[in-house]
């Protein structure tokens, strides 16, 4: 084949639409934003929805459970004080699970609402369903 056979091919790349870079950045920022936040017990200040006017569920979601366990296991691995009696456990995740089962984890879950307000829930206020 000669080079003349390929002269009529257009490989300039004009077939693709230009993508607005700002739109992609906005989408990525929205995806990275979580609807929950883990807060230390002393860090929950005012400004949220009062306990009597909460609208979210009193059940801990599997995502909140995973985040609480991961956060607490990391704290335990970094030599944080343990809130339960140990029966020979050395794995931080197992210790965190034991603390969660006894509702002794000193963490507050902050749930953000669509109107940018939030609700603070302590671990002992939430109902956990064993899966």
Swiss-Prot record:
Which Gene Ontology BP annotations are present?
transcription by RNA polymerase I; transcription by RNA polymerase II; tRNA transcription by RNA polymerase III
Which Gene3D superfamilies does the UniProt record give? Answer: 3.90.940.10
Q: What are its GO cellular component terms?
A: RNA polymerase I complex; RNA polymerase II, core complex; RNA polymerase III complex
Any idea which UniProt keywords this protein has?
DNA-directed RNA polymerase, Nucleus, Transcription
Subcellular location(s) of the protein: Nucleus
Residue ranges of region Disordered? 1-24
Which molecular function terms from Gene Ontology are attached?
Answer: DNA binding; DNA-directed RNA polymerase activity
Top-level taxon: Eukaryota
- InterPro entries associated with the record: DNA-dir_RNA_polK_14-18kDa_CS, Pol_omega/Rpo6/RPB6, RPB6, RPB6/omega-like_sf, Rpo6/Rpb6
Tell whether Nucleus is among the UniProt keywords: yes
Q: Which family does it belong to?
A: Belongs to the archaeal Rpo6/eukaryotic RPB6 RNA polymerase subunit family.
What is the purpose of this protein?
DNA-dependent RNA polymerases catalyze the transcription of DNA into RNA using the four ribonucleoside triphosphates as substrates. Common component of RNA polymerases I, II and III which synthesize ribosomal RNA precursors, mRNA precursors and many functional non-coding RNAs, and small RNAs, such as 5S rRNA and tRNAs, respectively. Pol II is the central component of the basal RNA polymerase II transcription machinery. Pols are composed of mobile elements that move relative to each other.
Quaternary structure, from the entry? Component of the RNA polymerase I (Pol I), RNA polymerase II (Pol II) and RNA polymerase III (Pol III) complexes consisting of at least 13, 12 and 17 subunits, respectively.
The record's section on PANTHER family has: DNA-DIRECTED RNA POLYMERASE SUBUNIT K, DNA-DIRECTED RNA POLYMERASES I, II, AND III SUBUNIT RPABC2
The protein's name is DNA-directed RNA polymerases I, II, and III subunit RPABC2
Q: Which organism is it from?
A: Drosophila melanogaster (Fruit fly)
Q: Specify the taxonomic lineage.
A: Eukaryota, Metazoa, Ecdysozoa, Arthropoda, Hexapoda
């Amino acid at each position: 084949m000669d080079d003349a056979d390929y002269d009529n091919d257009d490989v300039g790349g004009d077939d693709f639409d230009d993508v607005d870079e700002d739109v992609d950045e906005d989408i990525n920022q929205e995806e990275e934003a979580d609807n929950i936040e883990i807060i230390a017990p002393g860090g929950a200040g005012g400004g949220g929805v009062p306990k009597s006017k909460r609208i979210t569920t009193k059940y801990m979601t599997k995502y909140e459970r995973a985040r609480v366990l991961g956060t607490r296991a990391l704290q335990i691995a970094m030599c944080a004080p343990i809130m339960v009696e140990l029966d020979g456990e050395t794995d931080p995740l197992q210790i965190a699970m034991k603390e969660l089962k006894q509702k002794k984890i000193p963490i507050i879950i902050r749930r953000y609402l669509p109107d940018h307000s939030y609700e603070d829930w302590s671990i002992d206020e939430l109902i956990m369903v064993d899966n």
